Design a protein with these regions (language model features):
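Beta-strand elements of repeat-based all-beta scaffolds
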Residues: 1-378
Length: 378
């Protein structure tokens, strides 16, 4: 860092090709003006006398420029592509409230914003009341605390009739959602326990039904129990030291259909997921599964393996290997899959080996240039 506490350089010492460095430069009043990545790609910024960024030159997107009004609102934006034709995206304001976004091409995609005046109803005084864009319009209604209580969405479907959808919300004094009415008039109600946590979800349309019958929590406010309307129950347990999910069990119809156990590394990356549920009866879906994961020193997924055992002698396994460069771009992805009696009676061996290359020309850096794909199936 420099004397003002600004970061001058970051170094990651465990990249696949050595150190990964990023350098930062500032002007005399500590504004960021230059960033250089580990491959030497440079991003620069310029500012006006009001500390407003007027230009960004990025190795991938080129030069993007901005102009402002006296109050600091963005008036125009010009990307590298628009600059070739001398065009701009423009912005309109009313008392510093954005009222319009105007595109140089396809004006039907312009966006307009309307705000409630002093006589507006439904608590809309000074608030966004209507937004129009190329897809149609959406109207907003508010409660006394400024929460959105209703929207009316009007969609313009080409060669079709105009469609309108109304959605409504009701909240309690703690601003918790109590009720939601969908455009098809289905009403969903939410119930909470004494601690303010969601406990039940109930639906009504012609007749009543529960989506979620019960949710339970522990003293750490982590979910420990969930029961759906069909009777399926999910149980959650956590490790006592770091409160990470340790086991997830799903019971339905008197059977355990999922019994997942999780392990982690010191920084909470998932190392394994093992489903120890019983192998189902003949003809039934499901089964036992196990997955393992490894990571590099930068916590990027390097490899994964998995196995499956189901009814009727169904088995499967896979391996996955990933490669990255110092810019954190994927450079390779290789997967091998073996199945027995899963999709058909017999053995299937399949896989792919992908290699990724990226653009190097100005304006195309970081963009995916080519994918070499090798597939096989036996």
């Amino acid at each position: 860092t420099n004397g003002s506490g600004k970061t001058l350089k970051t170094i990651q010492k465990s990249g696949p090709d050595g150190e990964i460095t990023t350098s930062f430069e500032y002007d005399g009043i500590q504004r960021l003006v230059r960033v250089t990545d580990t491959e030497g790609n440079v991003t620069t910024s310029t500012y006006d006398m009001g500390d407003r960024r007027t230009e960004v030159n990025h190795p991938a997107s080129g030069i993007t420029s901005f102009t402002y009004d006296a109050l600091g609102n963005v008036l125009t934006k010009q990307t590298a592509n628009l600059a070739k034709e001398g065009k701009f995206i423009t912005y309109d304001y009313d008392y510093q409230r954005l009222t319009g976004i105007n595109y140089p091409d396809h004006p039907e995609n312009n966006v307009k914003y309307y705000y409630g005046g002093r006589n507006a109803s439904q608590n809309r005084i000074g608030r966004l009341m209507l937004r129009e864009d190329g897809t149609g319009a959406i109207e907003y209604f508010y409660g006394k605390m400024g929460e959105v209580t209703k929207t009316r969405r009007t969609m313009i479907v080409p060669n079709q009739a105009i469609a309108t959808y109304v959605t409504q919300w009701t909240y309690d004094s703690h601003n918790r959602l109590l009720e939601m009415i969908y455009p098809d008039e289905e009403k969903i109600t939410y119930s909470y326990n004494l601690g303010g946590q969601l406990e039940k979800v109930h639906g009504y349309k012609s007749y009543g039904y529960d989506y979620v019958s019960k949710i339970g929590y522990d003293k750490f406010e982590q979910r420990t129990y969930l029961k759906y309307c069909n009777g399926a129950e999910t149980f959650y347990t956590y490790d006592p030291q770091r409160r990470r999910l340790q086991n997830l069990t799903v019971n339905s119809g008197g059977n355990t259909i999922m019994d997942n156990a999780y392990t982690y590394d010191a920084v909470s990356n998932v190392l394994s997921v093992v489903n120890g549920a019983s192998v189902p009866q003949s003809g039934k879906a499901g089964g036992q599964m196990a997955h393992t994961y490894t990571y590099d020193a930068l916590y990027r997924l390097v490899s994964a393996t998995g196995t499956y055992t189901g009814a009727d002698n169904k088995t499967a396994s896979y391996t996955l290997a990933m490669g990255y460069d110092n810019m954190h771009r994927i450079t390779s992805k290789r997967q091998i899959l073996t199945q027995n009696n899963v999709q058909f009676n017999g053995t299937l061996n399949a896989g792919y080996d992908l290699s990724y290359t990226y653009g190097t020309e100005t304006g195309k850096k970081f963009q995916l240039a080519n994918v070499k794909d090798v597939n096989y199936r036996t």
